[in-house]
Amino acid sequence: MKKLSILAVLAASPAMAATGPFLSLSNTNFIVTLAFLLFMGILLYAKVPGRILGMLDKRSVQIRTELEEARALREEARTILASYDRKQKEVQEQAARIVASARDEAQAAAEQAKADLRASIARRLAAAEDQIASAEAGAVRAIREQAVSVAVAAAADLLSRQMTPAAASASIDESIKEVEARFH
């Protein structure tokens, strides 16, 4: 600070170029120089430059601390951003896996439904064929029974027309003998 004061005094040397005696109180340049030197002396006596330097040092330390905090916050923000990006990628991958799994399950369910439908159709078709076969067998049986009934009725009618009482009596006796022979 002393060097600064000396430099300020030397910088006032252009005031020496004024006309008239320099050390006169009527010379304004001399008065201004005296006031400046007195002001500088008061500042030095009150240790203002040291205080200013102390405040500037404190401010520089505070700025340095804030810069370090800002760097730490920036690094923390980068770390959080990287973590967020990783988590977002993981969530996207998990969502893709869930969609693929759901798609596979839906396809499997569709295939199972198709297989179940085919099996149901096959069962119904088999049941219908069984019903048709049963109906055919019933119809054939009914036709045979009807044919047997018609044949028996026709044979009975034919026999009753052709049979005489003596032939009927002989036929009955012969049938009785045949039954006795079979049972004994």
UniProtKB/Swiss-Prot annotation:
It is found in: Cell inner membrane. One of its GO terms (cellular component) is plasma membrane. It is a single-pass membrane protein. It comes from the Bacteria. The chain crosses the membrane at residues 4-24. GO terms for molecular function: proton-transporting ATP synthase activity, rotational mechanism; proton-transporting ATPase activity, rotational mechanism. Keywords: ATP synthesis, Cell inner membrane, Cell membrane, CF(0), Hydrogen ion transport, Ion transport, Membrane, Transmembrane, Transmembrane helix, Transport. InterPro entries: ATP_synth_b/b'su_bac/chlpt (IPR002146), ATP_synthase_B_chain (IPR050059). F(1)F(0) ATP synthase produces ATP from ADP in the presence of a proton or sodium gradient. F-type ATPases consist of two structural domains, F(1) containing the extramembraneous catalytic core and F(0) containing the membrane proton channel, linked together by a central stalk and a peripheral stalk. During catalysis, ATP synthesis in the catalytic domain of F(1) is coupled via a rotary mechanism of the central stalk subunits to proton translocation. Belongs to the ATPase B chain family. PANTHER family: ATP SYNTHASE SUBUNIT B, ATP SYNTHASE SUBUNIT B', CHLOROPLASTIC. F-type ATPases have 2 components, F(1) - the catalytic core - and F(0) - the membrane proton channel. F(1) has five subunits: alpha(3), beta(3), gamma(1), delta(1), epsilon(1). F(0) has three main subunits: a(1), b(2) and c(10-14). The alpha and beta chains form an alternating ring which encloses part of the gamma chain. F(1) is attached to F(0) by a central stalk formed by the gamma and epsilon chains, while a peripheral stalk is formed by the delta and b chains. This is ATP synthase subunit b 1. It comes from Cereibacter sphaeroides (strain ATCC 17023 / DSM 158 / JCM 6121 / CCUG 31486 / LMG 2827 / NBRC 12203 / NCIMB 8253 / ATH 2.4.1.) (Rhodobacter sphaeroides).
